């Protein structure tokens, strides 16, 4: 077996001194791509030659001004408007929590409250009540094969009217619109009138007539408030 090479104390001190000198050299100044070493920049030779070559190849780079870090500013402004800032646990007993499905700013119309348990109706027209009953029944039977108990709102209902058959509507009239939401044991139906020429939107919006033939008030919206 080949004998392991041995070094004298002077040789070890010289190697350590050369290595620490190289480290101090690169740590004392900034390094860019030009001063970094590659295989082509290191000539063959002993440690002293390699260290001298590295010192010769490296180019001093002027240190640029240190850019201050931007401080992140945290704004306390709420990015949205809260309708009710009172926590639910601090509300009085039996106080209904505002329903997010109902719009905060509504046009003039009627609000009907229907208690599903007792069947009590506070206010509203016949159409809105029947529409709420039909919507509740459709929701409860949508995943079953049972026939609905009531035929309210169907074609067999004497109060049923199919749209588009009346020529008077084409000349300009009002269109009754509804917004239905379930809040606990209550069904809330909000209804209002829009001109027949107004677009149909998903939100409760009040439009004005653009065709010039729709009346300002019809028989259905006379009692709206």
Curated annotation (Swiss-Prot):
Q: Which Pfam family name is an example for this entry?
A: zf-Paramyx-P
Cellular component GO terms, alphabetically? host cell nucleus
Question: Polar residues compositional bias: what residue ranges?
Answer: 145-157
Set out the biological process GO terms recorded for this chain's protein: symbiont-mediated suppression of host cytoplasmic pattern recognition receptor signaling pathway via inhibition of MDA-5 activity; symbiont-mediated suppression of host JAK-STAT cascade via inhibition of STAT2 activity; symbiont-mediated suppression of host type I interferon-mediated signaling pathway
Complexes and interactors = Interacts with host IFIH1/MDA5 and DHX58/LGP2. Forms with host DDB1, CUL4A, STAT1 and STAT2 the HPIV2 virus V-dependent complex (VDC); this complex targets host STAT2 to proteasomal degradation.
UniProt family annotation: Belongs to the paramyxoviruses V protein family.
- What function does this protein fulfil? Plays an essential role in the inhibition of host immune response. Prevents the establishment of cellular antiviral state by blocking interferon-alpha/beta (IFN-alpha/beta) production and signaling pathway. Interacts with host IFIH1/MDA5 and DHX58/LGP2 to inhibit the transduction pathway involved in the activation of IFN-beta promoter, thus protecting the virus against cell antiviral state. Efficiently blocks type I IFN signaling following infection by targeting host STAT2 for proteasomal degradation. Also plays a role in viral growth by promoting host RhoA-induced F-actin formation.
Q: What is the protein name for this chain?
A: Non-structural protein V
Biological source species: Human parainfluenza 2 virus (strain Toshiba) (HPIV-2)
Provide the taxonomic classification: Viruses, Riboviria, Orthornavirae, Negarnaviricota, Haploviricotina
């Amino acid at each position: 077996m080949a004998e392991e090479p041995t070094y004298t104390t002077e040789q070890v001190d010289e190697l350590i001194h050369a290595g620490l000198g190289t480290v101090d050299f690169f740590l004392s100044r900034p390094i860019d791509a030009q001063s970094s070493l590659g295989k082509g920049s290191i000539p063959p030779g002993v440690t002293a030659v390699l260290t001298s070559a590295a010192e010769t190849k490296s180019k001093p780079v002027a240190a640029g001004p240190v850019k201050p870090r931007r401080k992140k500013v945290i704004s306390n402004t709420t990015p949205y408007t809260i309708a009710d800032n009172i926590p639910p646990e601090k509300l009085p007993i039996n106080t209904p929590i505002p329903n997010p499905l109902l719009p905060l700013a509504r046009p003039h119309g009627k609000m009907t409250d229907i208690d599903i348990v007792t069947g009590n109706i506070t206010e509203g027209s016949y159409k809105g009540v029947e529409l709420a009953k039909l919507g509740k029944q459709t929701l409860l039977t949508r995943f079953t094969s049972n026939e609905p108990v009531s035929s309210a709102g169907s074609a067999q209902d004497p109060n049923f009217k199919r749209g588009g058959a009346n020529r008077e509507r084409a000349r300009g009239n009002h269109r009754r619109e509804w917004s239905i939401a379930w809040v606990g044991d209550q069904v809330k139906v909000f209804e209002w009138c829009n001109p027949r020429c107004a677009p149909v939107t998903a939100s409760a919006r009040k439009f004005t007539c653009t065709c010039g033939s729709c009346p300002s008030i019809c028989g259905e919206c006379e009692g709206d408030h």
